[in-house]
Structure formats: C-alpha cells, structure tokens
A protein has these predicted regions:
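RNase H-like nuclease fold core
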Residues: 1-47, 51, 58-63, 142, ...
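RNase H catalytic domain
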Residues: 8-14, 55-140, 144
Length: 159
C-alpha cells in the first residue's frame, strides 16, 4: 500500500489554534482506496504531521519477520518528520531522549509511540516528497489537513 500524509496548523503554536492532518491510502499501483482526516486544537503543523505518520504506522505497519509482505510506502512533505522517524529518534533514544543541544525533543509522546512500535518489529518505508509542487496526492492530503476538502468529498471524487 501507498500512503500520503500531511499536517497543518493555522496560528502555528499559538493558544487555541486549529490544526489537523490528512491521510490518503492507495493501492500499490496507485488506485485510490480511502481518505482520513482529523482536526485538533492547540497544536502545531509538525505535531499534526507526526500524528498522521504515526497513525499509518499503527494501522498499516508491517512486521519485519513477514518478509513476503513489503512495508507500506508513506510519503510526507515534512523533512522534520521524515528525519525524526528515519534518523534522529534512534540517537535520541540512545541518549535517554535528549537531543545534542541537551533539550528534550518536542512531540516526544508521538515519537516514543512510533519508536516503541518500531522496536516491536513494525516498519513503514517513510519517504520525503516535495511539498506544494503539484504532486496530486500530496495536494489532496494538504487540503484534507487544512480542512479545505472533506473526507466525503475526496471519496466522492476519487472513490
């Protein structure tokens, strides 16, 4: 399976802001399967994107010992999120969840949840996609994350 994720927030990091994330699920050959979106308050765009990726990991992560089944490919336009889950979290875990600047990583609850699932042997193939560059499904999840289109509308258009 292939997934596109995006997170968004208006008033990023400010009190009583509005944010959300969107996910689109596709078959391996790119056919639309489903869409999902969730709205939040008092959040950040990074937190929402991490939540989207974590949701895919928890619902579609593949056990490594099932080598007959390739991990789902997950596209995100957030370098922060891709680097966090593909690289940085391993260093932070070795340092008792302290970054090189001696600070605790932001969104540690989400990062630890992903890491724990990873350590149980679950995997996704998380890849960076360039944002706001005309990539069809990345544009759709951006609209889901910002609330500019509903899950129902996406399902009606592409389902």
């Amino acid at each position: 399976m292939i997934y596109y994720t995006d997170g968004s927030c208006t008033g990023n990091g400010k009190v009583s802001n509005a944010g959300g994330f969107g996910i689109v699920e596709l078959t391996d050959d790119g056919a639309f399967v489903s869409a999902y979106a969730k709205r939040s308050v008092d959040t950040t765009n990074n937190r929402e994107e991490l939540k989207a990726i974590l949701r895919v990991m928890l619902t579609a992560g593949t056990k490594v010992n099932q080598d007959w089944n390739q991990p789902s490919i997950v596209y995100s336009d957030s370098a922060y999120c891709v680097n966090t889950f593909n690289d940085w979290m391993f260093r932070w875990a070795k340092n008792n969840w302290i970054k090189s600047d001696k600070k605790i990583p932001e969104n540690l609850d989400l990062i630890k949840a992903y890491y724990e699932h990873y350590m149980k042997g679950y995997r996704i193939d998380l890849r960076k996609v360039k944002g706001h560059n005309g990539v069809k499904w990345n544009e759709v999840v951006d609209k889901l994350a910002t609330g500019k289109i509903s899950v129902e509308e996406v399902n009606k258009i592409y389902g």
